[in-house]
A protein has these predicted regions:
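Terminal targeting signals and extreme-terminal segments of soluble enzymes
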Residues: 1-149
Length: 149
């Protein structure tokens, strides 16, 4: 998901544990692997991304670090856009967010959203990160498809 040239065969389906039935891009983005793991699945035509907050995701005040929230929002741009990104590479060219509320260790953190416009090379996406139904982060971003040269 970084625009690199590595061979990619899509997200992997998780078959056991808490995340059985979800998909992950584990191994595709080293930074997300360090921060996550993050997961996504389709529910009634809506892409939902999620992860379980851990102590390592918290700031000094005991709440989820804003950088972790933004990393998850960036991941969510790609999961929300998954149907538009099959067989192409892409990079984030813009990501904006407004912090709305906290999460604590142990919380299930989720996101949903939509592609608001899909052009030839650009995808415009918006979404909401929440926990327990309470909003945490409103985000929007732009993804650029990278075509092989």
């Amino acid at each position: 998901m970084d625009g690199g040239n590595e061979i990619w065969d899509g997200p992997k389906l998780v078959t056991d544990g808490e995340w059985a039935g979800w998909r992950t891009w584990a191994g595709m983005d080293a930074f997300e692997d360090q921060t996550g793991p993050f997961y996504f699945r389709e529910e009634n035509g809506v892409i939902r991304s999620a992860f379980r907050a851990e102590p390592r995701h918290m700031n000094g005040g005991g709440f989820m670090h804003g950088g972790c929230m933004m990393t998850f929002a960036d991941y969510s741009l790609f999961s929300i856009s998954w149907a538009h990104l099959k067989d192409v590479r892409a990079v984030t060219v813009s990501l904006n967010g407004e912090f709305l509320g906290p999460a604590k260790a142990g919380d299930l953190v989720e996101s949903t959203g939509e592609v608001t416009k899909a052009g030839g090379s650009l995808l415009f996406v918006r979404g909401l990160v929440s926990t327990g139904g309470a909003p945490m982060l409103n985000f929007s971003g732009v993804i650029k498809k990278i075509r092989p040269r």
